[in-house]
């Protein structure tokens, strides 16, 4: 995809905070597949800048941006704990603007995350939670080697309060 439409993948830096917040606000309007609360969406850019600085300097955290024509159209993150006993586990999250769904961007970003994790040699488990009804995402994760470990009944809710089942999925790095 990157050759076809000129997508740039790069790590986020503190100066990206405002654009990331705009993009995440748009994604939150477009889909109920993500679980974002008001606090995350109303985060002051300065606070996110500090968080982005920490992530950028960290060896076991990553925020990858997909940029097209100067606009952030997707993010892929890996968040790991600083505590030694959990520092080998990275929680994966991917968000893509709806206009760019189905174009291979999720695959591209997930390949980059897995490659980064293997190269860093610090993370030995990637994990994520995904709504069972998000078939497109489940297909992507399975295609990339993630395994379903559990079904969490009532693991999430819709805006109308309907309970949703959620998969716990993982990818083990040898």
Q: Where are the regions a protein language model picked out?
A:
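Acetyl-CoA-dependent GNAT
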Residues: 14, 28, 40-99, 110-111, ...
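A short, aromatic/hydrophobic, helix- or strand-capping loop or linear motif
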Residues: 32-39
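Conserved GNAT acetyl-CoA-binding A-motif
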Residues: 110, 117-129
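Conserved catalytic-core motifs of GNAT/GCN5-like acyltransferases
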Residues: 125-130, 142-162
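A short beta-loop-alpha structural element at the N-terminal edge
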Residues: 8-22, 172
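Terminal substrate-recognition subdomain of acyl/acetyltransferases
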Residues: 1-3, 160-174
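Conserved active-site alpha-helix within GNAT-family acetyltransferase domains
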Residues: 103, 107-108, 119, 132-150
